[in-house]
């Protein structure tokens, strides 16, 4: 889930340098009075572990935290069953942020005396994030659950995660079965992302759609509805997962296809490099089909009636590289492609993302092509201490084939840069608190409404990220 959600209303602020300089100076003043780190809520309260045992910086997991998650939120000892818990233990964590941010976006369409023009819009002020309400753990040993009601800043709730998992089926770590709505098995988890701005608070690779494309169903950053089989070696060095998903982008109520499914597959191998740490390499692939043809009533599409399935795919590699105790780099690559039907604007007609209905007899124009793209994400972290982490991210996505012959080859290309840090003055088994500071710059080619020129957006954000 994105802790902060909004439209991409950003552009480079004029006083960003001075704001960031003041923030960094204050960070080092506070650092001089730092305390030792302790534990995080919910699971920390259950097992009495330091939170740094599972997290590089909460909510991002380290190697041990990933193993704990893969084991179904268990340490694989006789205390995993709820019967060993204190009757007063309540496995719940709330998370929310009060923030200040400055957002600016150029080339927005506004009315003027002579018609419409493009103009920069900039705003700043105090705000709130959404609210996450986490609860999870074990119903019995080797039967795990996780429920996450989540809201936006106006307290409009939905279920981000609802899942139950059978762990260690037949006594083997190689067979675990999960059913419900859950995050896909992304090693670089967007749900545990450290950044919070509108464009920096998501991984663009996980949600990219070419300009004019009608396919919302290939977003690997969205929690999906389905069933997953996952397994791992006892030490978690070798991992695999395979999921069968409804092609509905995690939406409930069967709103889209009458019979459309997707699959997500991932595997990885970790290896020890001595003092450098445990490195991991892996791959992932999402392949599926989604509807382009809809029954209508009075011209409006009927939910659940979608047929005329067309294909899409996303595949790539993941690397997690550690260089001692203080520095690591996460890398993700992706090649994506959609059917030419999606590229022409067919697909999600229910939500208005697509504009065309593939009715019987429809033929694509001769200039139509299957859109394809390549992208890379590089995210380094410097962990000064368990209480202070500096981070950066560079993402770029480049179209390798546009949906139509004659379109400019770089239309819709994205480049984004994010830098920030998080300082935790304390972390206990009852609560967590982080002073969060971040700057994001986002650039997309040729997508302004009137002039079809480039859009540059930016956001600077500071706030108190806390859970309890």
Protein language model features and the residues they cover:
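Sequence/structural segment immediately N-terminal to covalent heme-attachment motifs in c-type
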Residues: 40-50
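The canonical Cys-X-X-Cys-His
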Residues: 48-58
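Outer membrane beta-barrel
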Residues: 62, 93-103, 109-111, 118-250, ...
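Outer-membrane beta-barrel pore domains
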Residues: 162-166, 170, 275-468
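N-terminal secretory signal peptides that target proteins for export/translocation
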Residues: 1-16
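C-terminal segment of classical bacterial N-terminal signal peptides
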Residues: 28-37
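Short Fe-S-cluster ligation motifs
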Residues: 77-96
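Short cysteine/histidine-rich metal-coordination sites, predominantly Zn2+-binding motifs
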Residues: 64-78
């Amino acid at each position: 889930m994105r802790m902060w959600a909004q439209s991409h209303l950003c552009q480079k602020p004029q006083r960003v340098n001075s704001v960031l300089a003041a923030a960094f100076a204050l960070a080092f003043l506070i650092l001089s009075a730092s305390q030792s780190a302790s534990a995080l809520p919910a699971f920390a309260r259950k097992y009495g572990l330091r939170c740094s045992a599972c997290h590089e910086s909460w909510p991002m997991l380290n190697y041990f935290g990933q193993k704990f998650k893969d084991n179904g939120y268990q340490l694989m000892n006789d205390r995993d069953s709820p019967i060993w818990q204190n009757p007063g233990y309540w496995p719940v964590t709330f998370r929310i942020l009060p923030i200040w941010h400055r957002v600016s976006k150029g080339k927005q369409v506004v009315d003027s005396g002579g018609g419409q023009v493009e103009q920069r819009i900039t705003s700043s002020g105090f705000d709130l994030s959404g609210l996450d309400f986490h609860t999870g753990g074990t119903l019995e040993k080797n039967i795990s659950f996780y429920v996450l009601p989540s809201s936006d800043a106006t307290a409009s709730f939905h279920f981000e995660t609802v899942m139950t998992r059978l762990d260690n089926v037949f006594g083997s770590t190689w067979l675990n079965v999960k059913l419900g709505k859950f995050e896909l098995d992304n090693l670089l988890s967007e749900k545990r992302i450290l950044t919070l701005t509108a464009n920096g608070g998501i991984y663009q690779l996980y949600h990219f759609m070419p300009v004019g494309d009608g396919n919302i169903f290939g977003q690997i950053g969205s929690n999906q509805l389905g069933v997953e089989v996952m397994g791992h070696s006892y030490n978690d060095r070798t991992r695999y997962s395979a999921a069968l998903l409804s092609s509905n982008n995690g939406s409930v109520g069967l709103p889209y296809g009458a019979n459309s499914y997707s699959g997500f597959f991932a595997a990885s191998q970790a290896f020890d490099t001595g003092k450098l740490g445990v490195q991991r390499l892996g791959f992932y692939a999402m392949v599926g089909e989604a509807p382009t043809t809809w029954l209508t009533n009075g011209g409006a599409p009927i939910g659940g009636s979608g047929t005329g399935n067309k294909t899409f795919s996303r595949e790539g590699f993941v690397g997690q590289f550690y260089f001692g105790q203080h520095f690591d780099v996460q890398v993700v690559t992706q090649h994506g492609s959609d059917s030419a039907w999606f590229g022409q604007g067919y697909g999600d007609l229910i939500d208005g993302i697509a504009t065309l209905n593939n009715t019987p007899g429809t033929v694509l124009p001769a200039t139509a092509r299957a859109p394809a793209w390549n992208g890379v994400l590089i995210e380094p972290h410097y962990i000064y201490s368990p209480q202070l982490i500096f981070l950066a991210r560079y993402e770029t996505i480049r179209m390798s084939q546009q949906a139509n012959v004659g379109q400019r080859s770089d239309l819709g290309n994205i480049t984004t840069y994010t830098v920030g840090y998080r300082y935790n003055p304390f972390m206990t088994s009852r609560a967590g608190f982080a002073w969060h500071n971040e700057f994001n710059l986002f650039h997309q080619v040729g997508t302004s409404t009137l002039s079809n020129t480039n859009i540059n957006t930016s956001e600077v954000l500071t706030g108190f990220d806390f859970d309890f």
